[in-house]
Amino acid sequence: MQNRLSLFFLCMFFLITSLNAQEGMWIPSLLSGQNEAEMQEMGMEMTAEDIYAVNEGSLKDAIVHFGGFCTGEVISDQGLLLTNHHCGYRQIQSHSSLENNLLEEGFWAESHEDEIPNPGLFARFIREIQDVTPLILNGVKPSMTEKERQDKIRANIENVKSQFELGPFESMDIKAYYKGNQFYALRSVRYDDVRLVGAPPSSIGKFGADTDNWVWPRHTGDFALFRIYAGPDNEPAAYSEENIPFTPNHSLPISLDGVDEGDFTLIFGFPGSTDEYLPAIAIEQLVEEINPARIEVRDRALAVMDEAMRNDPEVKIQYASKFASIANYWKKWKGENLGLTRTNAVESKRAEELAFRKKLRNNEDWLATYGGTLLKLEDNYRRSLQLRKSDAVYGEIVNRNVEGLRMAGYIARLISFYEEGGDEAFRSFANRLVPFMENMYENYNAGVDQQLAVTLLEAYPDLMPKEFVPRVISENKNDLDNFIGEYYKLSKIPSKAVLDILKNDEPEQAVEKLKKDPLVLLVSDFDLMYRQDILRPLADIETEHDSLMRHYMAAQLLVADEDARIFPDANSTLRVGYGKVNGYEPKDGVKYLHQTYLDGVMEKYVPGDYEFDVPERLISLYEAKDYGPYAENGKMPV
């Protein structure tokens, strides 16, 4: 079984098992020149054109950007779409209620008519990827300031986009790669009618929940099925009962053969973001300062939500998707810190930097151009640490994890729009804000949100420099429970009364009412401090950082050895990774196999547990060893 594609690996852009380290996230249109020979030597029987082609069907035509935040794969000629359970979790949750709890019970449509629409969900296909670097950097000069450079690049991007001939329903996006040293245009088409077809219960699709997230061995049945629908002409169309299942240019065939150690495997998808080429000081600050602060905030937020969800089944449904979203990066940051510490990543980076500096010193031209870049970049990180850490904490508490504060921030922005642009500006923003807030309120519990506000604002003074703490918080630090309770009681945001004002009042009346709202006043105090003391100075430092990082990246590309594997950081664009399936040894005396089985699920099973419960039906199948054609030597692969 040497040369099969593993659909399981395609479904998850990053491997849970270990690849035989051919690291990289490569641009599909460049595989023939960069990677094809190596891939074929490793066992791939396809060609680069089988993976990426413009004028005929190829693997890329079966890979979609699912909702703009995940990867999905078309696995039938009727638009059936496979993705992860956690990627479809928000949609599954949105269709759940106490009476019809799809999260707990799962869902399987018995016909096309039973498939459930998901407003706002889309599937985007990449049609073509083109290198447009010379066009985007046309007229960009070394003597330009960073602002002049960015202004010129933005103008060039708009000019280039206007010159592309796009088909119906197509769009063009131009993305920076290698920290702004290269640019690629991505032509795509978006389908907006994507319906839920099937999902296992969370005790399978989310088995192990946060304890097992981002770690191995994993026993989660992390999958869900959707279907793309199109108009009668197979072109994108808004939801309609008249739409029909989409016929793709290519779909992935399903194999029941599984994978063996040593099999070649290909990963195709849309990874979010990475920072492969940071200097050592950035990694050090991330591990020691920024990640711990973000983890501390989310520790507190998750504890509040977890208690509320365990005590109230309705809250459990309301907050399931939010909890999973917050927990995902919380666990990732914890694992990131653990991995970077265990692998001595900072010391390894410093060794690379010594070698980098040595190469520069051996070439006068390189030294003249890039000799001071790394020193300046390190100085930039030292000067910006407290600002970047404070920005992260502020974002976690005020802009993300407390919805009452978040909505108050939007109202404060609406008031600013009115003060600057009058009735027209108010109505323009309000028309977008109302449906957004209505969507937030669908899964909002004022009591839970109030407790989140109290808990996180209690942590705020401990995580921020004193000068970044608004006086209203420092003065009420020892009585935040009552202080915040009174604000939530008097505010029109937790009660949803704000929607009536936005919908029914004239702009002037609405502004007069809303500018006196306690939560709006509180957030306005935060926002004034944030913009003056954090955002403005940080913006200047970040502009300098972006320039230095671009030069540092250019220098790394310039001095790299011929066989160096320098791939661009992930930026939510289509990429390819590849390697061989293997287990790995994370530490002394521990070896992980390449595959897990249902036996491991039952070993972890804890009856009634929040994370490790198992459905009765699955227990019965396990006890009867009733695995149908899916067994592997009498065992059921997960």
Provide a role label for each language-model segment:
Residues 8-17:
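Bacterial N-terminal signal peptides
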Residues 18-638:
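Terminal presequence/propeptide segments associated with secretion/organelle targeting
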